[in-house]
Amino acid sequence: MRSINLANVSFLEARDHYVFISTVHGAVYKVRDSMTNQSRVFEQYGFLRVHKSFAVNMKHIEAIYTTEIICAGRSIPIGRSYKKDVQPAFLAYVGGQ
């Protein structure tokens, strides 16, 4: 088991029964789990589920557009079913800091 500094985690991506945890330094860690489980764990640390395959660290959001988020320099798609929750959640996060 490896310890990861959550402040450095930029986003989570689910692929093929694994969740890939990407950091701002370019490191990627692979965990065999579902995005549902991992996003619930990370949610309490300021992560937001934005797509069936992605959750982002709101600390690293650079821009929010209609269909994508720029997070730590990477374009992350916003899923249709998550779209209505993204902006209010981000504004609440920024307002709570």
Q: What feature does the model see in each segment?
A:
Residues 1, 8, 25, 70-74, ...:
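Eukaryotic intrinsically disordered, low-complexity regulatory linkers and tails enriched in Ser/Thr/Pro
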